[in-house]
């Protein structure tokens, strides 16, 4: 099974979903992380404020921070390879990385615009 490592910028808590001004992208990603875990996916998250040594000890992450700064986070590594930086992925992107069919995601084409109909 593939492993996704997420290196988050410094946040007040492990998910960033706290306080009064919550970033919707973090809410969505936190929900998607839970969904992936239910699908049996291995995910590890590291918060720069809470686990700075994890950033220093990983050579790829260390090099990324030296080149892009903490402003370039989040950094996502899939089996040790960079798959995304600077934003959190959408559920469809996560599904593609892990080979989860889109119908399991609720994003499969449906209705009259899917298939060979001309009703749209």
Swiss-Prot record:
InterPro entries assigned to the protein according to its UniProt record, in alphabetical order: Arsenical-R_ArsD
Domain of life: Bacteria
Keyword Metal-binding: no
Gene Ontology biological process terms in this record: negative regulation of DNA-templated transcription; response to arsenic-containing substance
Record keywords, A-Z: Arsenical resistance, DNA-binding, Plasmid, Repressor, Transcription, Transcription regulation
MF GO annotations: DNA binding
Protein's UniProt keywords contain DNA-binding: yes
Function of the protein: Inducer-independent trans-acting repressor of the ars operon.
Name used for this protein in its record: Arsenical resistance operon trans-acting repressor ArsD
Protein source organism: Escherichia coli
């Amino acid at each position: 099974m593939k492993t996704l490592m997420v290196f988050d910028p410094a946040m007040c808590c492990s998910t960033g979903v706290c306080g009064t001004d919550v970033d919707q992208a973090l809410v969505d990603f936190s929900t998607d992380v839970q969904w992936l875990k239910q699908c049996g996916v291995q995910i590890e998250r590291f918060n720069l404020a809470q686990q700075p040594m994890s950033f220093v000890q990983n050579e790829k992450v260390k090099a990324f921070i030296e080149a892009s700064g903490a402003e370039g986070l989040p950094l996502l590594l899939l089996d040790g390879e960079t798959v995304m930086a600077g934003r959190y992925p959408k559920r469809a992107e996560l599904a593609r990385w892990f080979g989860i069919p889109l119908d399991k995601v609720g994003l499969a084409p449906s209705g009259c615009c899917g298939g060979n109909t001309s009703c749209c």
